[in-house]
Amino acid sequence: MGWQNVSFLTDVSHAEPMCDALLEAGALSASIEDADAGTPDEQPQFGEPGSVNTPGWMHSRVVVLLEPDADIEALLAEAGAAIGLSEIPAYSVENVAEQNWVQLTQSQFDPIRVSERLWIVPSWHETPDPAAVNLILDPGMAFGTGSHPTTRLCLEWLERNVSEACTVLDYGCGSGILAIAAARLGAGHVAGVDIDPQAVEAARANAERNGVTALFADSATPVAGEYDVVVANILSNPLRVLAPAICAHVRPGGKLALSGILREQIDEIIAIYAQWIPLQVADVREDWVCLAGIKP
C-alpha cells in the first residue's frame, strides 16, 4: 500500500504556518513549492550571497505526504483551524506507490567519468575502471559531487596542474572533492577550508573514505601559509570579497584556479585579481568558466 500526496495552493503568509500545522496534525512530510515554477512569473529564492531575496513565493503550493488511511479533509481542517483559516483549501490527491526509497535514490546517481583517468563513483557502485583514479563520493549536505560544470572544470584543471608532492589548498572546499582529487593525483600536503562547519565534517569523512590525508578547517581556525596550487570553486560574490585572502595563499610562482564564474563575469573577476595574479580563461563548460593564472 502506498501513501497519499496532497497538494494545494496558498499565499506566502500561510504557506509555512500551514506546513507546520500539518506536521503537527500528523503529516509525514510537508514542503513548499513555487506555484509559478516554469512560467515567466517564477520567483528565484536563492542567489548570490548578499543579494536580496523574497521570503517566500507569492503563489505557493504546499505538498503534503500522508498515511494511506489518513482522513485528508479532517487533517486539513485541523491544520487550517490552528492557523485561523475558516475554510479547507481546494486540493488534489495523488497516490504514491510504496518503494524502496534508498534504492530509488541511489539509482539516480551513476559514476561520472571526468576524464580518461579520473572517475567519481558513489560508494554503492562498482568502480567502472579499477585502474583509474576513482573518487568515492556520495551525494550529501555539502556542495561538490562532480555533476556541476564548475566542479568538473576544476577537476580537469587539477589533473593538468597537480604535480608530484606539490602543496594544494581547496578554498571553499564543500564536500572536499577537489582536495581529495589533488591528493589522489599525487599532491603532497593538501588542505581545505570552508565557512560551513558541516561541509568541513563532510570533507573529513570523504577524505577518510578515500584513504587520503588532508587538513580541513572552518573559518574559526583558518588555514595559514602559501601553497603551490590554490583552487576556489565558489560563487562570484565571495570570489570578489575574498580575493586578497585567496591570493595571499598562493606562493610566488604558484598557480591559482577560480570557478563558480559565469561568462558575463569574466572581465570583472580578471580585473579584481589583476593586482595580485593575472588570470585568463582556462576552460569553459556550458555558461561556466574556469579562470587560472600564475602568481608573479
Swiss-Prot record:
What is the purpose of this protein?
Answer: Methylates ribosomal protein L11.
Spell out the protein name for this chain. Answer: Ribosomal protein L11 methyltransferase
The organism's taxonomic lineage, starting at the top: Bacteria, Pseudomonadati, Pseudomonadota, Betaproteobacteria, Rhodocyclales
Top-level division of the source organism's lineage? Bacteria
User: Which gene produces this protein?
Assistant: prmA
Repeat as UniProt keyword: no
Query: What are its GO cellular component terms?
Result: cytosol
Task: Please state which protein family the record places this protein in.
Answer: Belongs to the methyltransferase superfamily. PrmA family.
Q: Name one GO molecular function term.
A: protein-lysine N-methyltransferase activity
Top-level EC class:
transferase
Q: What is its EC number?
A: 2.1.1.-
Which CDD domains does this entry report, sorted A to Z?
Answer: AdoMet_MTases
For this UniProt record, the keywords arranged alphabetically read as follows: Cytoplasm, Methyltransferase, S-adenosyl-L-methionine, Transferase
Q: According to its UniProt record, what is one Pfam family this protein matches?
A: PrmA
- Biological process GO annotation list? methylation
Reaction catalysed? Answer: L-lysyl-[protein] + 3 S-adenosyl-L-methionine = N(6),N(6),N(6)-trimethyl-L-lysyl-[protein] + 3 S-adenosyl-L-homocysteine + 3 H(+)
Q: Where in the cell is it found?
A: Cytoplasm
Q: What SUPFAM superfamilies does the record point to?
A: S-adenosyl-L-methionine-dependent methyltransferases
Q: Which residues bind S-adenosyl-L-methionine?
A: T151, G172, D194, N233
